[in-house]
Amino acid sequence: MAYRNPLPVVVALQPVYDTQGTALVVVTRTIAPARGGTALPGGFIDDREDWRHALVRELQEETGITAEPRDVRLADAMSAPDGYLLLFGLLPERPAAELAPPAPTDETEGWDLLRRPTELAFPLHTLAVRAWFEGRYI
């Protein structure tokens, strides 16, 4: 019998606020899968890497935004039909003005703010965004 274990993926929920209200940080992807699509920042956990460290590493790699692993709280865990296990980590709300400015990275066109739930490039990201805007991750 062969076993296939799920591949763990971390996804960052970084709430921010400004004069227009509260929003979530999202990215526009420049790599497959979902090139050109809008998604939450995230990616694979490296071998023997703590999931909170992976989450803040991916957030910084894709947005330039820094955060502390100790500030990450597990908001949700969802299994994707393609064999991935997504761990959604919630970070504390921050002022948008204090974030690194949006700039292209190796994997994204930079970051933007999502001000209301909308369909994202990955269905589970869409579900998590909807849950966050409905207040289910508070």
Predicted regions and their residues:
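N-terminal strand-loop-strand
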Residues: 1-39
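Unchanged
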Residues: 43-138
